[in-house]
Amino acid sequence: MESQGGGTILLTRGDIALKLGLPVAGVVGFVHSYADGAHTSIPAPGLGALAAGMGGKDSKLVHDLAKLGVTPDDIAVVSKHDTSTNANDPNESELHNTLAHAIGRTDGNPLFVISQKSLTGHAKGGACIFQVNGLTQLFKSGVVPANAALDCVDPKLKRDDHMVWLREPLKVGSVKAGLATSLGFGHVSGFAAIVNPGAFEASVANTAGEDALNEWRDRANARLAAGQRRLEEGMMGRAALYEPIDNRRFHEDGRGYDAHEVEKAMLLDPNARLASTGYFEA
């Protein structure tokens, strides 16, 4: 039976997270998609995402991470798509190892591999969402998970001197950043660098002050606690785990409100916001 998993990531600007008291699980240090080559097989993985390192030590990836205080040596892990196919595993490993050398990672500095599917199974459409979520969990725990299914490693991967596959969990402590990639599937590759949420806190402290940072922490922790309570109440049947939104936040009032026209206007207006009624108004 065919099935798909999925997931949702709430992505906001830092000032919005501060204003709303949103918990921050990670900071997007760099994100890009790439064509990975013309292949006879639609899901065949290529090396297109290696272009993330275009320019080497002078690449946009290196410069963007530097703005957050992260160097190539600070990237502790890579969460790989790892489909255990003859094509994907060697290609993805070669890509990250080549990239590490290109952007100036110190020889001998290990780059630990997280094979997310060995932990959660293959979500297919939601696979990289699982990978990014796994990186945010690493920021919290400081523990790199092992690949319990690692019975043998493709001999081709021996060439990749930075890459390390763990057979047991490894506590590494504070992690500054990690990479996540998804290769192939429509000749498109996705590449993201996720940075520890400490980068957000440092930015708030520098731009808004310690008082603003402490206020944000209090509000964010309250949101986390409320979310955990709601989850547990839902698991015990005391609250709904899902409540549908009425008509996608558009409504028909039988008079001058045309949901179709209001939706078009909302999509074209950069200042469009939900009204206090919970709907987009005309």
Where are these regions (language model features)?
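Acyl-CoA/ACP chain-elongation machinery
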Residues: 1, 31-48, 80-90, 107-161
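Solvent-exposed alpha-helices and their adjacent loops that cap or buttress functional pockets
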Residues: 1-3, 20, 70-71, 105, ...
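Condensing-enzyme catalytic core mediating Claisen C-C bond formation in acyl metabolism
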Residues: 1-70, 76-77, 195-262
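Buried hydrophobic packing segments
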Residues: 7-13, 61, 96, 129-139, ...
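Short, glycine-/Ser/Thr-/acidic-enriched flexible segments
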Residues: 15-17, 33, 83-85, 118-120, ...
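A glycine- and small/hydrophobic-rich beta-loop-beta segment
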Residues: 48-77, 82-87, 92-110
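Internal helix-turn-beta structural module
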Residues: 138-186, 190-191, 200, 206
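Extended non-globular C-terminal regions
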Residues: 263-282
